[in-house]
Amino acid sequence: MLNEQTSEKLYQMKLNGMAEALKDQLAQPDINQLPFDERFSLLVDRQWTWKENKRLDRLLQNAKLKLNACIEDIDYKRARGIDKSVILNLAGCEWIRQIQNIIITGPTGVGKTYLACAMANVACRNGHSALYMRTPRLLQQLVIAKADGTYVKIMNKLAKAKVLIIDDLGLAPLADSERRDLLEVIEDRYELCSTIITSQLPIDLWHDSIGDPTIADAILDRLVHNAHKITLKGGSMRRKKI
């Protein structure tokens, strides 16, 4: 009865991992042979693991990644222009701590979105928040937000994500309001958080794609100068891993 009460109190205090570990210990006939400090250490370790798993689940859920992509699943044998040493170096997340960006370019279907989501996934596993947005949807949401009064809220959300994926930049010409909204998003994050950009267009065509020379200069200056650039090549691998 006492053990049941203790377990229930642990659950009420949201120490679920510790409560589950206690149940496991009580189910072992020889558990009393372990010293108290060892048993307690096992309880704490389980609680720590439970808490970290919950945090990762929350980060991944909030990230809304388009693909369930993992660095470990990347196939380097295919001729896609993926340098394994570069990817493994980025997987250490130092680029996030240094507030650097990643730009992934290449034709459709070569795995740009997969690689971007894999980078965001490993960022979440290292405790960083992330958020995935396709460029058309991002710009559409900002238009709606201006109309319904949630613009500031959405801009704050975009600004606070430690890693923001802006997928498919340059798919279509930008209207003047869209250029300005994109600049505001980039400006709010500049030298504060990291951004991953994917695009079918090579970087040297972005200026013309964005349109207005002054705004294009401002966007590119904030995105490109401190970015790790990855250029993918080859045919479409749609519905396949990289």
Q: At which residue positions do the language-model features occur?
A:
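Conserved phosphate/pyrophosphate-binding and hydrolysis machinery centered on Walker-type P-loop NTPases
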Residues: 12-15, 29-34, 46, 64, ...
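Interdomain "pre-motor" coupling segment immediately N-terminal to P-loop NTPase/helicase cores
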Residues: 11, 16-67
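Conserved P-loop
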Residues: 82-160
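Pre-Walker A (pre-P-loop) alpha-helix and adjacent loop at the N terminus of AAA/AAA+ ATPase modules
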Residues: 27, 60-61, 65-68, 72-102
